[in-house]
């Protein structure tokens, strides 16, 4: 039995199936970790959601920014963007079931060996603290009044964490750190505009602020950073939807598996 962490799929269903064949995935023995952004930009978001949801407990999925965007679109709180490609999900006969399955996913996951999050973790948070904060968001997403949370989720303010934050501001900072952040200051002030691997003045990649802290982290979200196999923090977003590759890391021995992707979008997005 093995566990494979897989980078941002973003609707690239054919490439996902090729990757699983590449390492001989067994539904009876193996587990899959997905770093988020199952949907959008690629052509087959519906197939991806149906396949991954059907894996049951064999698949652990953390929510990414595109997954949350799908939820807000479905509930009518976000206008369609020109490059959105999940109409197949919105128009599907099983859309409600898939959306409910998606919003029941965590935004952070950890076991005794590894931690997984889509974007990053702020330097002030220990793994245990971050898991507790993630649980606050997960409870809001799963509550009967979850639509109110989705309605108030978006925004880039506040830019930094404080234990005194409450209400929508508190939940928004947690969501932004775990699904949108790339750079922050040592004090935890986040920056959301830059997407390249080069930090803006005064900022550093979030993972550089966590050197020597706790168990290793696997994450995605950062195609312009690309594949980064560091024992402390590994980025598995190798830009499949942009013409790069789809990557999987076997967590037991850190063996890497990749398949080439044809690319559905011009490089440079998120």
Pin down the residues of each PLM region.
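Active-site neighborhood of divalent metal-dependent phosphoester bond hydrolases
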Residues: 46-49, 54-169
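Acidic, His/Gly-rich catalytic cores of divalent-metal-dependent hydrolytic chemistry
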Residues: 131-270
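Active-site environment of divalent metal-dependent phosphoester hydrolases
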Residues: 12-14, 40-43, 66-72, 109, ...
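Active-site-proximal beta-strand elements of phosphoester/diester hydrolases
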Residues: 2-10, 114-120, 235-236
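Divalent metal-coordination and catalytic microenvironments
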Residues: 8, 37, 52, 64-65, ...
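A short, conserved beta-to-alpha structural element at the edge of catalytic cores
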Residues: 30, 35, 39, 57-74, ...
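N-terminal active-site segment of His-dependent metallophosphoesterases
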Residues: 1-55, 68
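Residue-level marker for buried hydrophobic side chains located in beta-strands
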Residues: 5, 34, 61-62, 115, ...
């Amino acid at each position: 039995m093995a566990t494979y962490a897989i980078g941002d799929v973003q609707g690239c269903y054919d490439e996902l199936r090729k990757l699983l064949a590449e390492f001989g995935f067994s539904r009876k023995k193996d587990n899959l970790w997905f770093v988020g952004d199952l949907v959008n930009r690629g052509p087959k978001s519906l197939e991806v959601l149906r396949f991954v949801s059907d894996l049951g407990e064999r698949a652990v999925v953390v929510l990414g920014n595109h997954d949350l965007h799908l939820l807000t679109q479905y509930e009518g709180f976000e206008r369609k963007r020109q490059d959105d490609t999940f109409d197949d999900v919105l128009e599907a006969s099983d859309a409600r079931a898939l959306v409910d399955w998606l919003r029941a996913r965590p935004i952070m996951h950890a076991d005794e060996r590894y931690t997984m999050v889509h974007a990053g973790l702020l330097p002030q948070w220990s793994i245990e603290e971050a898991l507790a904060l993630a649980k606050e968001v997960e409870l809001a997403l799963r509550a009967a009044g979850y639509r109110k949370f989705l309605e108030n989720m978006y925004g880039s303010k506040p830019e930094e964490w404080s234990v005194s934050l409450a209400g929508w501001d508190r939940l928004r900072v947690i969501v932004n750190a775990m699904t949108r952040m790339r750079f922050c200051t040592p004090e935890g002030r986040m920056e959301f505009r830059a997407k390249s691997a080069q930090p803006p003045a005064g900022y550093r990649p979030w993972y550089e602020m966590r050197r020597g802290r706790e168990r290793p982290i696997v994450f995605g979200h950062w195609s312009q950073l690309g594949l980064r196999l560091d024992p402390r923090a590994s980025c598995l977003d190798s830009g499949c939807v942009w013409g790069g590759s789809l990557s999987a890391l076997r967590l037991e021995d850190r063996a890497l598996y990749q398949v080439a992707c044809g690319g559905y979008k011009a490089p440079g997005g998120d």
